[in-house]
Amino acid sequence: MAKRPGPPGSREMGLLTFRDIAIEFSLEEWQCLDCAQRNLYRDVMLENYRNLVSLGIAVSKPDLITCLEQNKESQNIKRNEMVAKHPVTRSHFTQDLQPEQGIKDSLQKVIPRTYGKCGHEKLQFKKCCKSVGEYEVHKGGYSEVNQCLSTTQNKIFQTHKYVKVFGKFSNSNRDKTRYTGNKHFKCNKYGKSFCMLSHLNQHQVIHTREKSYKCKECGKSFNCSSNHTTHKIIHTGEKPYRCEECGKAFSWSANLTRHKRTHTGEKPYTCEECGQAFRRSSALTNHKRIHTGERPYKCEECGKAFSVSSTLTDHKRIHTGEKPCRCEECGKAFSWSSNLTRHKRIHTREKPYACEECGQAFSLSSNLMRHRRIHTGEKPYTCEECGQDFRRSSALTIHKRIHTGERPYKCEECGKVFSLSSTLTDHKRIHTGERPYKCEECGKAFSLSSTLTDHKRIHTGERPYTCEECGKAFNCSSTLMQHKRIHTGEKPYKCEECEQAFKWHSSLAKHKIIHTGEKPYKCE
C-alpha cells in the first residue's frame, strides 16, 4: 500500500490501524486477570477505538470491539478474535488529520507505551500508564520506529504478568513488556497515586460524585460503565455462568468461582489470628471482627451495633415489621430466611438432626442441642434468686416469674393473667369450647394435650408416677402431688370465709356450699 508524504521537512509517515494500538493476551495470561482487570481491559479497548474514530481516522469496527460492545465475556473470545479477522481499513496521517494538541492528547490515552519524541516534531508520544521513566527515541522518520522499539526493549520494566502489546506502526513487531507497579498518576486532592491514567480518572469520580452511567430500568446511577453493565443483569435475569459439576447458573463469573469452592473444598482465605480458613474473602473480613471486636454497622433506630451488614439488615426488620420471606405452602411470612427454612420442615416433616445417643431426630439443631442435655445432665442456666438449674434458657425465664410475680399474658375475654403464653392458649379453649386433642381408643376429646396423655393411661394401665413414701403408683403427676399431701399434711386450699384449710381443691369447693347455701344436686 502506498504511503502519503507528510508536511515539508518530515519523513514518510506510517499507517495507523486499530491493530497497532490493540492489546493481546494469551489464554494463560487472560486467566490470571481478575474480574476488575478484565473490565478495565474492556473499557480501555473501547476507549482506544473511540479515540481513533474521534480523530477522524476511517477505521472499520473490528470483531473484538463488536464483542466488547455486546458485553461478550472476554475469556470466551478466541485469540483470533482478539485481532480483527480481516485487516481494518487503513488511513494515512495527513496534514488535516494532525491537529497538534488533539493528536497528542488522544495518543496519550491510545498508545500504551512511551516514547520521547520520534519523527515529526508535532507528533510527540507522551508518557502513559504503561511506561516508567523517560525514554530517548532516535530522531528521524517513522521508518525508524522499529529501531526505537528495539532500543528500548532492554529498558522495559518488570512485572509478574506478561502483557503482549502490538508494535506501534508495525504489524510485524510485537514485543513483551513488563510493568513495575510504579505509580505516576497522582490525585491532586488526596495525593493517592495510580499506575494507570484510567484508574486515576475512575478514582476522581469519587470526589466529584459524578455518576454518568444510568440504568434505564430503575434509574440507578454508577461511576463506572463496568458496574453499570454488571447491574443490568439484575433486570435481565441472565445467568451465563454455569457450574459444570452441578449445573447451577450464576449472573457473575466471580460468583461461579466462589461456588466452585463448594465442590473443591478450597478455602484460600486464612485468619492469621486463629488459622481458620474461609472460601470467601468477605467471610474472612467478617471473621476478623471477632478478634478485633469491631462492630461498624449501627442501627439508627436503637443504636445496636453489628459486625456484619447482613445482620443489621435482618435486625432492622424488627423495627419495620417487614416479613419478606413467605411460605409457598401456607402463605405464612417471616422476617428472616432462616425462620422460613425451619418452618418448611413442618410441611416436609424433615428432621435432619439426629441424636447419636438414642437416635431421636429433630427438625432444628437447637432442639437437638437441648435434647443432648438429657443424656449429659447438663443444666447451664441457673436462677440467681434460688440457685435452681435448668436445661433451657426459656425454662429459666419462666421460672423467674415465680420470684417476680410477672404475668404478662392476659385473656381478653375474662381478664385473667398468666405467666406462660402456652397457658393462656390453653385457657382460651375454655371460652371457645375447642377440644383439639382426641383419643384414638374411645374418641373422647380434650382441650389440653397433657389431659389426653393422662387419659391414654386409662387404656394402657400405665402408672409412671410412684409415691416415694408408700410406693403407691398413679397415672397422673397431679394425682401423685395430691396424694403426697396425705403424708405431708399440707393443706394449701383455704376458705376465705372461715379460714378452714383443705388438702384438695375439690374439698374446698364442696365446703363453700355451706356458706353460700347452694344446693346444686336435685332429685330427678
From Swiss-Prot:
Q: Name one GO cellular component term.
A: nucleus
Q: Which terms in the Gene Ontology molecular function aspect does this entry carry?
A: DNA-binding transcription factor activity, RNA polymerase II-specific; RNA polymerase II cis-regulatory region sequence-specific DNA binding; zinc ion binding
GO BP terms: namely: regulation of DNA-templated transcription
Q: Which SMART domains match?
A: KRAB (SM00349), ZnF_C2H2 (SM00355)
Kindly state the tissue distribution recorded for this protein: Expressed primarily in testis and fetal tissues.
- From the Swiss-Prot or TrEMBL record, state where the protein is found: Nucleus
Per UniProt, the keywords (alphabetical) are:
DNA-binding, Metal-binding, Nucleus, Repeat, Transcription, Transcription regulation, Zinc, Zinc-finger
Q: Where are the zinc fingers (C2H2-type)?
A: 185-212, 213-235, 241-263, 269-291, 297-319, 325-347, 353-375, 381-403, 409-431, 437-459, 465-487, 493-515
Tell me if Transcription is a UniProt keyword of this record.
yes
Which CDD domains does the UniProt record give? KRAB_A-box (cd07765)
Q: Where is the KRAB domain?
A: 16-87
> Which Pfam families is this protein grouped with?
KRAB, zf-C2H2
PANTHER family (alphabetical): RIKEN CDNA 6720489N17 GENE-RELATED, ZNF44 PROTEIN
> What function is annotated for this protein?
May be involved in transcriptional regulation.
Q: Give the record's family classification.
A: Belongs to the krueppel C2H2-type zinc-finger protein family.
> What is the protein name given in its UniProt record?
Zinc finger protein 479
| Phylogenetic lineage | Eukaryota, Metazoa, Chordata, Craniata, Vertebrata
- Gene it is expressed from: ZNF479
